[in-house]
Amino acid sequence: VLLSIEDIYNQHPEFEKAKIIERLVEPDRIFTFRVTWVDDKGEVQTNLGYRVQFNNAIGPYKGGIRFHASVNLSILKFLGFEQTFKNALTTLPMGGGKGGSDFSPRGKSDAEIMRFCQAFMLELWRHLGPDMDVPAGDIGVGGREVGYMFGMYKKLTREFTGTFTGKGLEFGGSLIRPEATGFGGLYFVNQMLQTKGIDIKGKTVAISGFGNVAWGAATKATELGAKVVTISGPDGYIYDPNGISGEKIDYMLELRASGNDIVAPYADEFPGSTFVAGKRPWEVKADIALPC
């Protein structure tokens, strides 16, 4: 990231005098807290929660909340740093931030996830607000989890404000929010190819993952005339030389909606496709690779 701004930085000695880089690489503040919740067996569980408010030079802190066993402060600091630049590139008045917990929603009931989200928000709510810090979803946090957190935020603040993005439509969310990131990624890829005089039609695309981003990317890639040949999950990846589109995408959405985030059943459902266990799809030859 820093290499990408090196030339501009060196053209402005006033940046060095003001120690802009030194100020950019450390967050404004970090909140670390214990999240105590009760599982379905009535046993008390404890996780760590974080919110990194990285930089608000051009607007309120903005960045997702991630629930995954791998979450730690180091990862969130880097993601918050990166988010600051990503948000600045939109030209919208948004700063950068990131948050999350080492809680994993996998294998948890809806009631357990709801109780955790409410306990998480019980610790974080006072540091959020439409003009202060506006979280969103990320890995392990979709519309359901955002809804649980926003519901608790409303209860605690007694206000209905634009403090979360990624909400469901019933909470004032955007109509195409689930697809938006994947769609945007493909528009960007298509624009890059066009600057080189390359047509995306007929190109093969390898995609990792099959969450909201990968779903949107696969859908838009197909609409633009490309052929998506891989998707992946925690169990491995699917290679489908015939292309992953239409009813195949619908099938994966139904599989995921059932709470099953593995991709192996795809190979049983659609002859001609191959499931490769325990690997990521980058060994597959393709014109475009999209880590989603």
Model regions and ranges:
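Glycine-rich, N-terminal phosphate-binding loop and its surrounding beta-alpha-beta segment
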Residues: 31-105
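Short, Gly/Pro- and small/polar-rich lid/capping loops
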Residues: 1-32
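Glycine/serine-rich phosphate-binding loop and adjoining beta1-alpha1 elements at the start
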Residues: 68, 87-201
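Ligand/cofactor pocket segment of small-molecule handling proteins
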Residues: 282-292
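Structural signal for hydrophobic packing residues in well-ordered secondary-structure cores
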Residues: 5-13, 80-88, 117-132, 150-161, ...
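Glycine-rich phosphate/diphosphate-binding loop of Rossmann-like nucleotide-binding domains
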Residues: 165-168, 173-282
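Structural motif
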Residues: 50, 93, 100, 131-133, ...
